[in-house]
Amino acid sequence: RAAENGDKPFLSATRDGEGRAISWNEAARQVAALAESLTRIGLEPGDRVMLVSENRPEWLIADLGIMAAGCVTVPTYTTNTTRDHTHILGNSGAKAVIVSTQKLARNLIPAVLFSSECNHVIGIEDIRTGQAPETINFHHWDEMVAGQADVGALDQRRGQRG
């Protein structure tokens, strides 16, 4: 459908009081770039990716990108506690999580630390991690949807590996 609708608006959101639209073409590009990035960080078809986000355009792009990589989306509630996240990570065997905000990451990161399978955290917004262990790789959404050819810099400081 992206080819049919091109630059027509597909998704929209209000950020900082301003409306912002994402075209069909841009959404398709981000989906493909995310799928490529998930594969690049080591995910394989059939791997699970937990998605912790409120309704926003990135949620749909994440879901489609996960599926385009051949992986399985594990959607969760934004009201989950650390205990809930720990249970879902253990039960699903998710190898990565995508989380939208620092607020949601507060209950998620301790569960990721406890998980034996999950070692990738992708933050849609900036996620402050403090003293993150070497076993967890943190990635920023903007880098994941930029596509390999679009990356101008990779931030390799502690807690921002990706």
Q: Model-predicted segments: where are they?
A:
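Structured binding elements
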Residues: 70
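Conserved residues at the C-terminal ends of beta-strands
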Residues: 12-14, 95, 100, 124-125
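Short acidic/polar active-site loop segments enriched in Thr and Asp
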Residues: 44, 95, 119
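AMP-dependent adenylate-forming
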Residues: 1-23, 126-133
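ANL superfamily adenylate-forming
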Residues: 16, 105-162
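Conserved AMP-binding/adenylate-forming core of the ANL superfamily
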Residues: 10-64, 81-86, 137-143
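Conserved ATP-dependent adenylate/AMP-binding module captured primarily in the ANL superfamily
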Residues: 78-113, 142-143, 147-148
